Regions:
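N-terminal secretory/targeting leader peptides
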Residues: 1-183
Length: 183
């Protein structure tokens, strides 16, 4: 999701908007492609920065908008699904290949189950947060149409191309497939 004190529906709506980012190079690139001015800022400073106009908007998860009360200082939130937050479990390949096959299989199964479980919790928390934000009446939620999503994807396509060189096309293709994106 992304927010501001104006609707962010079309890529042109971002022109000149100061948007708080966490420092992600990908976020920096795609916001610049939208015409925004990314501002790296600590998470703990975001509420006050939104309240005082140091930044015009930010991106975050629905649960963070609710718990951090960002919706109280932003008139408009776009439920955009423009970014995907993921975490990786990384293990040394020599260590991994040294484990017996049955142990690797059990660990993979446990990771799959843990991933499914935590994803279900995140989905529920975010759905509940959106309902609470809407119920508060303090901000307007905007949901993008398929055509609007396509316009965002087109505007951010150079970032997708750039990221291919960093993480590889197969990884991004898998992500696009999982998120049902047309890239």
């Amino acid at each position: 999701m992304v927010s501001a004190n104006r609707p962010l529906i079309h890529p042109a709506d971002f022109q000149g908007l100061k948007v708080r980012i966490s420092g992600s190079k990908i976020a920096d690139r795609y916001f610049r492609e939208l015409g925004a001015i990314p501002q790296i800022m600590a998470f703990s400073e975001v509420y006050q920065a939104l309240q005082t106009g140091v930044v015009d908007g930010c991106e975050n998860t629905p649960s963070n908008y609710l718990t951090q009360k960002f919706h109280e200082v932003q008139k408009d939130i776009t439920v955009s699904y423009h970014a995907h937050l993921q975490y990786a479990v990384i293990v040394n390949s020599k260590f991994w290949s040294g484990l017996p096959a049955d142990v690797r299989g059990q660990l993979e199964k446990a990771m799959d189950e843990a991933t499914d479980y935590t994803n279900s919790i995140a989905i529920k928390e975010n759905e509940d947060a959106l309902a609470e934000i809407k119920k508060s009446g303090k901000t307007h939620l905007h949901y993008l149409t398929d055509d609007q999503k396509a316009a965002w994807q087109k505007a951010m396509a150079p970032t997708y191309k750039w990221a291919q060189g960093r993480v590889g096309k197969p990884v991004l293709d898998l992500l696009a497939k999982e998120l049902n994106l047309q890239m």
